[in-house]
């Protein structure tokens, strides 16, 4: 399969610094989801901006905290679903449960109703997608709020897992910047779609 040349900088970085772990886990915490490479985030943000050009977006919704830096380029408010209820978030909230593929557990995500409503046009942003459970949770929150879902941007999609295809089958405008077709823990080889 011919590899897409867009976002080559991201794919090169995944190949250079990504580490494949047991259970089809791709560890990219040195530049994406623990320590953030701000110049790479800027390029990722610009690419999402290009791919969703012409769409009216009033809010970005992500799960804390990986999508926050990426969303900055859109110049609209970024709402992030919290993984734990805090005293700061009291009163009316949207909440749903999501299953984390990487962490192998289910957790609640919470968004205050104050920040998401029927007038919003929402773009979802997340760093990773495997089975798509986090995206399904965010989509449910958008539906519960009465807002309009514009689309979803994923930095790294595991194309060999069902999440991306399931969302596309539901008609979601999904843009994944790097789709991993396969990865080999023994050789360290990562093949992109």
Where would I find each of the regions flagged by the language model?
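Conserved acidic residues
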Residues: 58, 120, 150
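Short, glycine/charge-rich flexible loops or terminal/linker lids adjacent to PRPP-binding catalytic cores
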Residues: 76-122, 188-192
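Short Gly/Thr/Asp-enriched flexible loops that form oxyanion-binding sites at enzyme active sites
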Residues: 69-75
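PRPP-dependent phosphoribosyltransferase catalytic core
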Residues: 139-193
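Short glycine-rich phosphate-binding loop at a beta-alpha junction
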Residues: 57-64
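Active-site-facing substrate-recognition patch
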Residues: 2-57
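Active-site/ligand-binding-proximal alpha/beta "capping" segment
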Residues: 118, 126-144
